[in-house]
Amino acid sequence: MLPESDLAAVLDELRRLRTRVPQLTGALAAGVDGLVVAHDTPGVDPDGLAALTAASLGVAVRLADATGNGGFRELLVRGERGYVATYAAGRTAVLTLLAQDRVNVGRLHLEGRRAGARVGELLDAAEAEARRRPPERPARPTPARTRATRTARATATETPTATES
C-alpha cells in the first residue's frame, strides 16, 4: 500500500501533466499487475483501464523482446477519436495517458516520458522505503473464546459404584 503522501505526489504529477498537455482527457498510474495506483480519468473506469493496460503491456513487452528491441519503453495506440499512450514508470509501474485526436503527438511523448520518469521515481522510492522499514509485528490475536474454569474430576475411589449404593 502506497503511503498517503506518496499517493498525493503521484496524483499531483498526473494533474500537472494534464495542465501541460490540455488535450489529455485522462491519466492513470498503475502497477504492471493491473492494479490502480492513482488516476485522474473522468468518465473512464480506472480499474478496467489499468487491467487493459497490463494486458497490452504484456503483449508490448513480448513484441519488443521477440524483435530484439530491448525492454519496454512506451506504447501508442491511435483510435478514430484519440490516442492511448503507455509509458514505463519505474521498475513496477506504467503511466497511461488518454488524449484527443488533435493532440500534438510529439508533445504527448515529451511530457509523457517526463511524467513517467517522475512517477517511476516516486513509486520506486516508496517501494525502497517500505523495504528498509522493519516489518510490523502483527498483534497477538485474541482467543476466539475463553476457557471456563474446569472442575476437578472425581477419581475412581471417590465415585460410588452401583453395588455400593
Question: Where do the protein language model's features map onto the residues?
Answer:
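Acidic, low-complexity cytosolic segments
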Residues: M1-L24, D33-S165
